[in-house]
């Protein structure tokens, strides 16, 4: 059984770039059958997972395969750049 790849988006409540990025990321990730997308709002309730992944700014996107980080993107990226980055990192994750 093949493990799925995870994309985790960390965002903040008052982060305009996070809200702009969210629909773009959801649209891009939906084209991959073997990728799960999770959204985590950085708050007091999520501090344990924020510390685990050493998130120091939002938005941050992580790509994990078997719980091992294979990609990290900090800050807002235009859709075209994000699509290229996701393709590259997801392809790398599939090879692991």
Stretches found by the model and what they are:
Residues 49-52, 85:
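CheY-like receiver
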